[in-house]
Swiss-Prot record:
InterPro entries with a match to the protein in the record: Urease_beta-like, Urease_betasu_sf, Urease_subunit
CDD domains given in the database record: Urease_beta
HAMAP family in UniProt: Urease_beta (MF_01954)
Keywords per UniProt: Cytoplasm, Hydrolase
Protein name from the UniProt record: Urease subunit beta
Gene name of the encoded protein: ureB
Source taxon at top rank: Bacteria
Protein localization: Cytoplasm
Coiled-coil intervals: none
Pathway: Nitrogen metabolism; urea degradation; CO(2) and NH(3) from urea (urease route): step 1/1
Self-association and partners: Heterotrimer of UreA (gamma), UreB (beta) and UreC (alpha) subunits. Three heterotrimers associate to form the active enzyme.
Catalyses which reaction(s): urea + 2 H2O + H(+) = hydrogencarbonate + 2 NH4(+)
Family note: Belongs to the urease beta subunit family.
Keyword field contains Hydrolase: yes
Length: 101
């Protein structure tokens, strides 16, 4: 073993196993690309994105931590969302929640 070396287990690692999911169609109605990070409260994303915000309340993208999804102008795509975990408190973003979900 080399100091600092990380030896990962063999096989695939399933992310967010067992988390309930919801799939939404999202359209970028704006004239600029919008990028949304893995742990951003999806309901509070850029107003140029058109989707069912009530269905996205308390949820984030089901993608690996530290990654993002980019929506080009005029683009429509499906995204899968999972519930925010932990204390389920949301602060900042667009300041639409500022507390418990």
């Amino acid at each position: 073993m080399i100091p600092g070396e990380i030896i990962a287990a063999s096989g695939d690692i399933e992310l967010n196993a067992g988390a309930p999911t919801v799939t939404l169609e999202v359209s970028n109605t704006g004239d600029r690309p919008v990028q949304v990070g893995s742990h951003y409260h999806f309901a509070e994303t850029n107003a140029g994105l058109s989707f069912d915000r009530a269905a996205a309340h308390g949820k984030r993208l089901d993608i690996p931590s530290g990654t993002a999804v980019r929506f080009e102008p005029g683009q429509t795509r499906s995204v899968t969302l999972i519930p925010l975990a932990g204390k389920r408190e949301v602060y900042g973003f667009r300041q639409l929640v500022m507390g418990k979900l």
